[in-house]
């Protein structure tokens, strides 16, 4: 049944008055055409003046509106105007949505470009920072040249420029993201309004009221059920937690935490018959081992580990790009100053006397199983240094954290300096100087070739064993420790045992050989004895 016929039927039954019917008919038009409907109603009302029957008045009005007898616009024309207006509104909405979509596509494309530029800048920053880190490591290894110092300054300038550019691009990215967010919000609003109008036009107000009540009831039920489920889950998890705590020893559980991606590989470097007499090894992270063999070739067994992603067609290529390896008839040079590369190197050297050997490590151990050289310098910031057998004119060892051992060999001058770690000497140096801050010093002299010993430790004991057929002139002292001597055939020249200051001056005179001994410690004790005891 049409809406107008229903209104007329209600008037006939006396449910609605003519005034109420007129108001209801006026509300059937859109808000935009209300004034036109009022004019039409007034016109129809004027034509029906004198009619005393309210039912006839409403009927005449309905006939006038349906048949178009009035001079003003009819209800059908109003509906057509309303439809035209709605169509125009829809077209405007679609046009606005198209414009918003165009703006969104443009902003999205610009954002993609900015993101690509930011990714490129970050990659450049990463490469520059890696180069700077490599040069810094070279400086720590005392291998930085003047040209590399200039290069490092230029790299720092470039890094600052890249960081400034990155900040600018990041600001632009934030602005584009905000713009795109606002556009998406406007698009959503437009689409939602369009959808809401389409949906609303399909259902009556009565149905919407019923649906609202139904959804409210359902929502209440869902909330009630959700509360019950939440309470159940809470009780379940609490029970599970108590059970796990009572029955599981968490200290026995080991969990693997994802770390930096690593690449491992092994490679063997072979160099046929080089006549090099200089060896230069500098490694940021790794272990260096020297061995000698009966062949004239040089072989280096390398175990490499690369930390993180590195550019290169292969791990070997990535390693070579970050290393400087050169072996010829003058020098055997292996330099791996990159801290993202760990290189465990084992050198097999021909048996000969080398002029100069230099080994410098930041983190790692040095092991020399056998070596003959004129001048040997070894340094490790964090790691142990061990010489099993070394024959050298000069052996200089420098450490920071780690134990130092010189077990066997003949050395003319031996200088050892370190901060933290014990020092043990059982080789046969003629001149020995040991200085450390925290750690014990143990010197065992087996040959009468010893001529001088200088040993000092701030916090640690000093143990010195001397051959009983070696003439000595010694002075030892400690502030907070004690002096204990079991040397035979010695003459005590002077002894002081004051609290906080103990000293001993002793002498054993033998015409064949004499050695000068000086040892001091602040908080430790000094122990003297014969080597054979």
Curated annotation (Swiss-Prot):
Induction: Probably part of a liaX-liaY-liaZ putative operon. Residues 1-277 are annotated as: Binds the antibiotic daptomycin (DAP) and the antimicrobial peptide human LL-37, under physiologically relevant concentrations. Protects the OG1RF and S613 strains from LL-37-mediated killing in a concentration-dependent manner. Pfam families: DUF4097, SHOCT-like_DUF2089-C. Disruption phenotype: Deletion in the OG1RF strain causes anionic phospholipids to be redistributed away from the division septum; during exponential growth, there are increases in phosphatidylglycerol (PG), decreases in cardiolipin, with no change in lysyl-PG. Confers resistance to the antibiotic daptomycin (DAP) in the OG1RF strain. Resistant to killing of the OG1RF strain by human cathelicidin LL-37. Deletion in the OG1RF strain increases virulence in nematode C.elegans infection model. GO terms for biological process: membrane organization; phosphatidylglycerol metabolic process; response to antibiotic. It comes from the Bacteria. InterPro entries: Toastrack_DUF4097 (IPR025164), YvlB_N (IPR053959). Residues 63-89 are annotated as: Disordered. It is found in: Secreted, Cell wall; Cell membrane; Secreted. Keywords: Cell membrane, Cell wall, Coiled coil, Membrane, Secreted. One of its GO terms (cellular component) is extracellular region. May undergo proteolytic cleavage, allowing release of the N-terminal region into the extracellular environment. Residues 279-526 are annotated as: Putative adhesin region. Residues 83-186 form a coiled coil. The N-terminal region (1-277) is able to bind the antibiotic daptomycin (DAP) and the antimicrobial peptide human LL-37, under physiologically relevant concentrations. The C-terminal region (278-533) is involved in cell membrane remodeling. LiaX and its N-terminal region are released into the extracellular environment in daptomycin (DAP) resistant strains, such as R712. This is Putative adhesin domain-containing protein LiaX. The gene is liaX.
């Amino acid at each position: 049944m049409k809406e107008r016929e229903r209104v007329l039927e209600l008037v006939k039954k006396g449910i609605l008055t003519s005034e109420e019917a007129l108001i209801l008919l006026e509300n059937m038009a859109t808000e935009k055409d209300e004034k036109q409907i009022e004019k039409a109603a007034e016109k129809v009302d004027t034509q029906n003046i004198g009619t005393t029957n309210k039912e006839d008045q409403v009927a005449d009005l309905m006939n006038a509106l349906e048949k178009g007898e009035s001079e003003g616009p009819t209800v059908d024309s109003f509906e057509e105007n309303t439809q035209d207006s709605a169509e125009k509104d829809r077209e405007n909405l679609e046009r606005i949505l198209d414009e918003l979509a165009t703006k969104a596509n443009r902003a999205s494309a610009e954002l993609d470009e900015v993101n690509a530029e930011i990714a490129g800048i970050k990659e450049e920053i990463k490469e520059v920072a890696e180069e700077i880190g490599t040069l810094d490591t070279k400086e720590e290894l005392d291998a930085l040249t003047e040209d590399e110092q200039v290069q490092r300054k230029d790299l720092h300038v470039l890094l600052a420029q890249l960081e400034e550019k990155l900040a600018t691009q990041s600001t632009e990215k934030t602005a584009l993201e905000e713009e795109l967010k606002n556009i998406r919000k406007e698009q959503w609003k437009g689409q939602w309004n369009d959808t809401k109008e389409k949906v609303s036009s399909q259902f009556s107000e009565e149905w919407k009221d019923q649906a609202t009540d139904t959804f409210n009831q359902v929502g209440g039920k869902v909330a009630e059920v959700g509360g019950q489920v939440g309470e159940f889950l809470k009780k379940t998890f609490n029970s599970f937690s108590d059970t796990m705590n009572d029955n599981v020893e968490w200290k026995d559980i080991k969990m693997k935490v994802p770390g930096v991606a690593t690449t491992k590989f092994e490679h063997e470097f072979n160099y046929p018959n080089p006549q090099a007499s200089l060896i230069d090894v500098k490694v940021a992270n790794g272990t260096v081992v020297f061995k000698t063999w009966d062949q004239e070739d040089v072989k280096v067994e390398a175990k490499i580990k690369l930390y993180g992603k590195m550019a290169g067609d292969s791990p070997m290529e990535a390693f070579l790009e970050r290393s400087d390896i050169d072996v010829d008839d003058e020098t055997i040079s292996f330099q791996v100053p990159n801290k993202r590369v760990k290189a465990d190197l084992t050198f097999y050297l021909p048996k000969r006397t080398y002029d100069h050997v230099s080994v410098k490590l930041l983190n790692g151990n040095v092991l020399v199983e056998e070596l003959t050289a004129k001048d040997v310098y070894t340094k490790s910031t964090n790691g142990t240094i061990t010489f099993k057998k070394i024959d050298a004119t000069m052996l200089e060892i420098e450490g920071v954290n780690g134990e130092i051992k010189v077990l066997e060999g003949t050395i003319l001058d031996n200088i050892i300096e370190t901060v933290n770690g014990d020092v043990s000497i059982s080789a046969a140096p003629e001149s020995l100087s040991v200085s450390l801050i925290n750690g014990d010093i143990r010197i065992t002299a087996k040959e009468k070739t010893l001529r001088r010993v200088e040993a000092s430790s701030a916090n640690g004991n000093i143990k010195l064993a001397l051959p009983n057929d070696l003439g000595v002139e010694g002075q030892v002292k400690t502030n907070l420790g004690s002096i204990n001597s079991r040397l035979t055939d010695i003459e005590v020249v002077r002894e002081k045992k004051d609290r906080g200051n103990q000293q001993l001056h002793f002498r054993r005179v033998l015409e064949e050989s004499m050695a000068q001994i000086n040892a001091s410690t602040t908080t430790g004790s000094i122990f003297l004895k014969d080597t054979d005891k």
